[in-house]
Swiss-Prot record:
Family annotation (Gene3D superfamilies): Vaccinia Virus protein VP39
Protein name per Swiss-Prot or TrEMBL: Thiopurine S-methyltransferase
Any coiled-coil regions, as ranges: none
Outcome reported for the amino acid change (mutating residue 233 to V): Reduced activity
Organism: Felis catus
Length: 245
């Protein structure tokens, strides 16, 4: 879309009622993977991340990069190939195994002692570790702190009632001087229940504003044919860079 004024003027809906009580269970997310309903996965990686990669990495080497609700994001391999250390968390064991298989990476797995039934999958190279567990259980495990967080398909997937808890966990994982790249979606939430959920600017300020500088890097029209089935006629992706205040 070339009409930047249209993107700038995307209507903001009050995020108080429409999707407030919407809840997806962990089992429902697992079923999406089993049923192949993973339209959120991007086989070619995220184009806005590619475009703003230098801004995100800032020329630094050997960074620790966290991927919340990572799925089988191909960007994890990108960062690992650049010498960074990648840690992700994902509820679907199938998604994690598919990542290693599709990226032709050998790996090992071991139980996470602090979380019954949970596992961690580690690449043989040692710089990719994916935790298969509920993200909200993650504070029970010492996974260290991170220089970078790539939040695409995570905040927009968390049940709206859990956002504050989610944000607290994310910020607790950041190191001094962190850079947090956040992708969210704007559409008419009265027409689609989510997920992905609608996250307005005001919500981002409410969640992150007290501890982070918030800068919107770009807004792009990402409407595709498949979105018509959601009952919407537009969808805009916004990319934010959050930095330490």
């Amino acid at each position: 879309m070339d009409d930047t004024s249209t993107l700038t003027d995307v209507k903001e809906y009050p995020d108080t009622e429409v999707q407030k009580n919407r809840v997806l269970t962990l089992e429902e997310w697992r079923e999406k993977w089993v049923d192949g309903k993973i339209g959120f996965h991007q086989e070619q990686g995220h184009q806005l991340l590619k475009k703003h990669l230098d801004t995100f990495l800032k020329g630094e080497n050997v960074l620790r990069v966290f991927f919340p609700l990572c799925g089988k994001a191909v960007e994890m391999k990108w960062f690992a190939d650049r010498g960074h250390c990648v840690v992700g968390v994902e509820i679907s064991e199938l998604g994690i195994r598919e990542f290693f298989t599709e990226q032709n990476l050998s790996y090992s797995e071991e139980p996470i002692m602090e979380i019954p039934g949970a596992k961690v999958f580690k690449s043989s190279s040692g710089n990719i570790s994916l935790y298969c567990c509920n993200l909200f259980d993650l504070p029970r495990v010492n996974i260290g702190k991170f220089d970078r967080i790539w939040d695409r398909g995570a905040l927009v997937a968390v049940n709206p009632g859990d956002r504050k808890c989610y944000t607290d966990i994310m910020l607790s994982l950041t190191r001094k001087g962190f850079r947090y790249l956040l992708a969210v979606l704007s559409y008419d939430p009265t027409k689609h229940p989510g997920p992905p959920f609608y996250v307005p600017d005001a919500e981002i300020k409410n969640l992150f504003g007290s501890t982070c500088n918030i800068h919107c890097l770009e807004k792009v029209d990402v409407f595709e044919e498949r979105h018509k089935s959601w009952g919407i006629d537009y969808i805009v992706e916004k990319l934010y860079l959050l930095t330490e205040k």
